[in-house]
Swiss-Prot record:
InterPro entries found in the cross-reference section: ATP-grasp (IPR011761), ATP_grasp_subdomain_1 (IPR013815), D-Ala_lig_Van_CS (IPR000291), D_ala_D_ala (IPR005905), Dala_Dala_lig_C (IPR011095), Dala_Dala_lig_N (IPR011127), PreATP-grasp_dom_sf (IPR016185)
Binding annotation for Mg(2+) 2: 263, 265
Organism placement in taxonomy: Bacteria, Pseudomonadati, Nitrospirota, Thermodesulfovibrionia, Thermodesulfovibrionales
Gene Ontology MF terms: ATP binding; D-alanine-D-alanine ligase activity; metal ion binding
Residues where ATP binds: 127-182
Coiled-coil region: none
Domain ATP-grasp: residue ranges: 99-296
Descriptive protein name: D-alanine--D-alanine ligase
EC number: 6.3.2.4
Enzyme class: ligase
Length: 304
């Protein structure tokens, strides 16, 4: 069986994807698999044909690598792949769609509004309808790219303009003061969680991928009942989108202990600072064991 590790891509998360892909490639190599590294570009389909892979291990972050497009291409080609399917990938990447599904399933999310670029440009939206502080983010980006916490109208306008660089819709969320906790899910099990405490600001792109900028509390220092509730909520969010394989569910717990789900990441980072490998260690998985389990889950799903 020949495994193709597909990473890189052309999204704003390319560099992180390459680092994740290299780590996965090295692990599969050490596990004895016949493996090839494929840097995804517009010629991805041709590269896959040339390499004649039997299964794709997807480590693409953002853009068409995580929004269902590559997954759909692989299905047309008849090649199984790791992680979530076309629809689940598309829904998870679209923050507006996923939030509405979470609400339908009784999963709490921060109060939010959606701002369309055409309405904003035409001044059809009154900024006075938004209260501060709030979180402004692109509707379809990951790794906290284009995300800002804003405290006044001037910051709001700058944040909106930045977020619109990444798409035609922007999510504006109520800012929840609290603890940021991430739950790892593998297959149909919640592995555990980690609390992240950025040393400055919020858990930004820089804080996520730069050593020393974030403190990781593993497992979170919370009472056991709340921890179990968060794990149940993480698994419920994963299942509500019909996700497969390994995912990471991001949450905020407010000062009263109320949890809010922010998003589900269908292809979490697999770098040395990434959260899913840290969380998986709580369930007894080292990095190679996690990679092997993700691959084996996709093979089992493909057999069904």
């Amino acid at each position: 069986m020949k495994v193709g590790v597909i990473a890189g891509g052309i999204s704003s998360e390319r560099e992180v994807s390459l680092r994740s892909g290299q780590a996965v490639f090295n692990a599969l190599k050490e596990l004895g698999y016949d493996v090839v590294f494929i840097d995804a570009g517009i010629d991805l389909c041709e590269k896959i044909k040339i390499e004649k892979i039997d299964i794709a291990f997807l480590v693409l972050h953002g853009g068409w690598g995580e929004n269902g497009a590559v997954q759909g291409m692989l299905e047309v080609m008849g090649i199984p792949y790791t992680g979530s399917g076309v629809l689940a990938s598309a829904l998870a990447m679209d923050k507006e769609a996923s939030k509405k599904i979470f609400l339908y399933h009784g999963i709490p999310v921060p109060p939010f509004k959606v701002l369309n670029k055409k309405d904003y440009i035409s001044s059809a939206v009154s900024l006075s309808s938004f209260s501060f502080p709030c979180v402004v983010k692109p509707a379809e980006e990951g790794s906290s790219i284009g995300v800002n916490i804003v405290k006044n109208e001037r910051e709001f306008k700058n944040a909106i303009n930045e977020a619109f660089q990444f798409g035609k819709r922007v999510i504006i969320e109520k800012f929840i003061e609290g603890r940021e906790i991430h739950i790892g899910v593998l297959g149909d099990k919640a592995l555990g969680g980690v609390e992240v405490r950025p040393k400055k600001g919020f858990y930004s792109y820089e804080a996520k991928y730069t050593k020393g900028l974030t403190e990781y509390i593993l497992p979170p220092e919370i009472d056991n009942a709340l921890y179990e509730k968060l794990k149940e909520l993480g698994l419920k969010a994963h299942k509500s989108l019909n996700c497969k394989g390994g995912t990471r569910v991001d949450m905020i717990v407010d000062q009263q202990g109320n949890p809010y789900v922010l998003e589900v990441n269908t292809i979490p980072g697999m770098t040395e600072t990434s959260l899913l490998p840290k969380i998986a260690s709580l369930a007894g998985y080292d990095f190679k064991g996690l990679v092997k389990e993700i691959l084996e889950l996709s093979l089992k799903n493909n057999e069904k």
